[in-house]
């Protein structure tokens, strides 16, 4: 279903009738999101590619310690600073998703529903997996938290985090 990875939020089928494995694939696509430069939410395909290549290089480095490895994206070498930036973004992204899942699980919902709600709101996807009731099953507080998650996800985390830095509010 292209609506999941493109984050258009429009679906014509009832996903709850699909096999569970298919729902998990859609959940994975919710986290990856759209392409770089698009207005789609999510972690972005390019960042997922960089993470996969970093993991591959680290595995090869442990197997062949004397081998010199570089990471190439579209024919050009990706410097270490950019790689570290993507890894830091992944850490913040995972921390926020885990925090959302933890808070939303206080509503005593199924883990698939809670994880789907966290991914759907933070990545601005739209559909909710595991239930046909949509977001009506969540408490008002959870809906408020998911609203903030939508804003944080749309802004790609960092601009929102800047609001909490004391340097942002100093008059220097």
Regions found by a protein language model. Give the residues of each.
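Membrane-proximal intracellular helices of multi-pass ion channels
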Residues: 1-172
């Amino acid at each position: 279903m292209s609506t999941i990875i493109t984050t258009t939020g429009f679906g014509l089928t009832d996903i709850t009738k699909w096999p569970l494995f298919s729902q998990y694939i859609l959940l994975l696509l919710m986290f990856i999101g759209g392409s770089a430069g698009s207005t789609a939410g999510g972690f972005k395909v390019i960042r997922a590619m960089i993470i996969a290549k970093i993991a591959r290089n680290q595995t090869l480095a442990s197997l062949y310690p004397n081998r010199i490895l570089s990471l190439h994206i579209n024919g050009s070498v990706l410097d270490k600073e950019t790689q570290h930036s993507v890894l830091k973004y992944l850490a913040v992204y995972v921390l926020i998703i885990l925090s959302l899942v933890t808070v939303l699980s206080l509503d005593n919902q199924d883990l698939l529903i809670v994880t789907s709600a966290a991914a759907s709101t933070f990545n601005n996807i739209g559909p909710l997996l595991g239930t046909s009731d949509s977001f009506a099953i969540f408490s008002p507080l959870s809906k408020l938290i998911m609203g903030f998650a939508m804003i944080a996800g749309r802004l790609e985390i960092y601009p929102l985090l800047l609001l909490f830095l004391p340097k942002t509010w100093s008059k220097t």
